[in-house]
Amino acid sequence: MSKTTKKFNSLCIDLPRDLSLEIYQSIASVATGSGDPHSDDFTAIAYLRDELLTKHPTLGSGNDEATRRTLAIAKLREANGDRGQINREGFLHDKSLSWDPDVLQTSIRSLIGNLLSGYRSSLFGQCTFSNGAPMGHKLQDAAPYKKFAEQATVTPRALRAALLVRDQCAPWIRHAVRYNESYEFRLVVGNGVFTVPKNNKIDRAACKEPDMNMYLQKGVGAFIRRRLKSVGIDLNDQSINQRLAQQGSVDGSLATIDLSSASDSISDRLVWSFLPPELYSYLDRIRSHYGIVDGETIRWELFSTMGNGFTFELESMIFWAIVKATQIHFGNAGTIGIYGDDIICPSEIAPRVLEALAYYGFKPNLRKTFVSGLFRESCGAHFYRGVDVKPFYIKKPVDNLFALMLILNRLRGWGVVGGMSDPRLYKVWVRLSSQVPSMFFGGTDLAADYYVVSPPTAVSVYTKTPYGRLLADTRTSGFRLARIARERKFFSEKHDSGRYIAWFHTGGEITDSMKSAGVRVIRTSEWLTPVPTFPQECGPASSPR
């Protein structure tokens, strides 16, 4: 056992109390101005103050876990009911357009039709299982190889397509014959609703899709993703939207639009109105038409929900087409950026884009939509006058060293300009860091919760602890860091067969990771990362922004 680990064993990991409120009060004591990004009196540090505890489970004006879940389910049910009205009666005619809606819809259909031309031979090319737990399976059975190896679930309408893609894969057929798996996949009625944490007021509702539905849906999603990239919309790269948001915060040329519950706003009528008929018919067959909510079966008026394998790509394509059609109609050739419901368009036409979105049943989140001023937010990036002012959140009680070290690193990394941390937070950092033993200081990873980033000593050696964490020994330097991942053993022959089919689906490439060496060593380059510094650590403090 190393000396570092022995020292760790002698430490008290738990703190005497939750420091969350104390941290909030310390930041609030130095914050001035308004935390509302729409206000002329906006300041970044007030924004941090106002956002800090909004995801804390017990502090602030939040709800308990059961209430958060209940509200999320109720919100999903309401959205489903609203889409039912659109499906029966048409789009919201009280949301009139300042130009002919038929012209807009014709343009949208044309854009999407051209984008997706030649789709018939492209929908099955990248079908795959996800790593998530599908309907009818537990999380421990969520790995793709297990879905290939076991009897997969599917809805009745998707069964024919599922059999077609399975019968085109020789290893899959051999597996089914060898292990006497039924050629008729296990039928289920639809998807299942669950919730995940969002903030301290409400959870986020999503759905677990049946195995083969998800497999087919992801093929459609991959196809749309490829086609969108051909028109400059790269759904594999959030940084594009983030850079555009930064540009908009500097010169005001670009607006950022955020929609409220966009994934739960896509009606059946909307997709039917926009997509080529044959493609709509295929997507309609492989989606879930019914969902299980707390044991109750409901019919989905929504075309797809969060958790569906093509929802993200489908909504991105729809928003791209709406923005592009609006651009064309008003003769605007400015830059646009789309990443799901994170929409960026020229500020000049943003009011028209919002008008078109409202016509088709989408509601902007006005708190997070920025058309004027010098604040912009997109894809998790928050910019004010070109400076990253994204707040960090205390999502759980700060009642142990690991939680405290993470907050200390967040304090150092927040609002960095020119390599300098915000000087107003220095005293807060010093006071809180005094509760952390000196052996935990050093390192460069501001996302770490197992040491406190502090100049100038870089962490060099990692040691495993009984708690599964990696501790830094700062007494030595010059070694490269490595993460050790031990291979799992004792896979059954049946599961090995499933793993082979999964490997076959990825192209059958032979890589080093195919070798069974027992362990894998992954080198990192953390020692090259610069450390943000408080001005007080290197001379007289600079003036606050």
Curated annotation (Swiss-Prot):
The lineage of its organism: Viruses, Riboviria, Orthornavirae, Lenarviricota, Leviviricetes. It comes from Escherichia phage MS2 (Bacteriophage MS2). Its EC number is 2.7.7.48. This is RNA-directed RNA polymerase beta chain. This is the catalytic subunit of the viral RNA-dependent RNA polymerase complex. This complex is involved in viral RNA replication that produces (+)-stranded genomes via a complementary, (-)-stranded intermediate. Residues 243-373 form the RdRp catalytic domain. GO terms for molecular function: nucleotide binding; RNA-directed RNA polymerase activity. Keywords: Nucleotide-binding, Nucleotidyltransferase, RNA-directed RNA polymerase, Transferase, Viral RNA replication. Part of the viral RNA-dependent RNA polymerase complex, the other subunits are probably the host ribosomal protein S1, EF-Tu and EF-Ts. GO terms for biological process: viral RNA genome replication. It catalyses: RNA(n) + a ribonucleoside 5'-triphosphate = RNA(n+1) + diphosphate. It holds the Pfam family RNA_replicase_B.
